[in-house]
Amino acid sequence: MAGDELFSELPDQSKPKVSEDRRGVPRMREPVRDQIELRAVDIDSLVGQDHKVRLFWAYVIALDLRELEDRIKAREHTPGHPPIAPRLLLALWLYATSEGVGSARALARLCESHDAYRWLCGGVSVNYHTLADFRMSCTDLLDRLLAEHVAALAKAGLIDLAALAQDGVRVRASAGAASFRREATLGQHLEEARALVDELKREVEEQPDASTQRIKAARERAARERSERIEAAQKALEEIKAQRQEREEKRPNGKKPKEPRASTTDPQARVMKMADGGFRPAYNVQVASAAGEQIVVAVEVCNIGSDRGLMRPMLEQLPTLPGRYLTDGGFCSAQDIEWAHSKGVEVYCPPTQSKHGTDPYLPRRDDGAGVLAWRARMGSEAGKAQYKARSICECIHACWRNWDLRQLTVRGMEKVRAVVLWYALTNNILQGHRLANCA
């Protein structure tokens, strides 16, 4: 044959020697993925009895959610498709937050593949759109649940609300640095956006085809939303100018400020100095917590890059003022300290070091009664011992970082606050469980 002639001159290859015991080919269990199986699944056995997901369900099942259930239109003996139970959606987002899942699409995929989420769902199918809408639509509920949970922990004696600590963290906004525009550029973009909206409206009216109309209408909606964002950015520019003028009147430095810019992606975001020393679009998340127990008492979101002057707004929103209030040096403001002193709150905040090397604990001529008491308090050994508990509140931010609260996926201050409330309530559930076990 041709093959024999082709390889006739090659040397003979040595054949593998067969062992004397003739064991043969090894037998192994290999996957067969084209087979069809019928399995009996016990959903409750998917997770262990001490699994974290059961803690969140035990918390949710005991809540009064009538304010959400009353909105459901599908009723007994009436037509209509029943929606997903609000209790289930609440539990899904609480557990997902503790696992660092902040995307509705990712959560919807996990509900199909991950045992813990499948156990929560219990055979109920969920979609990402419902999950995303629920996450942003229940801010009032989260505020109430946070307050009720803190009150329950205080009533049980697990936390002491007489001493609170405040700390802030900058969280990266969902906006790029290139989206910040000056006033002239915003005006030019607004004219272009309005012209595009008018053109698309005319095209929609002229095209009789339904499919073409839908495409044109979608393009018109996108152009209209862009025009609205540019208008919001112009309003943000006016706010920035007013804030700069107010600061210049209080503390003139003689320097000509740079021309302000606002983002067309998220007009409420501001460029702030981050923890690594860089400047990026971000929000300032303020957290008031029980000093030492890592329990969040209140949260607030603002777009001010400095913590100075943010102590009083946080104290004003607390239902009951604490006896002691611990903050870091960035919150040190004489006006806030005087106001807190008038309300019976002792502020523990390290004074800023003087450029001239003078003792910051010595009284000064323009000090009020509150500032004088604060300097004496922080200069004493007892005051320094009280202040040591403040550093524990930073563990809350570290925990949130581990849960992937590094860059926001939503835009606007209201939605950012909703996301922060999810993190705060999740933190309190886990820390409250820890405190109860340690008691």
Which residues fall in each region the model found?
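Short, flexible loop/hinge motifs at secondary-structure junctions
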Residues: M1-D44, W57
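Anion-binding and metal-coordination hotspots
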Residues: M1-S14, G100-E112, V124-A439
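A ubiquitous short alpha-helical element
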Residues: G24-M28, R75-P79, E381-K384
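Basic, short loop/linker segments at the boundary and entry of helix-turn-helix/winged-helix-like folds
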Residues: V47-L94, E99
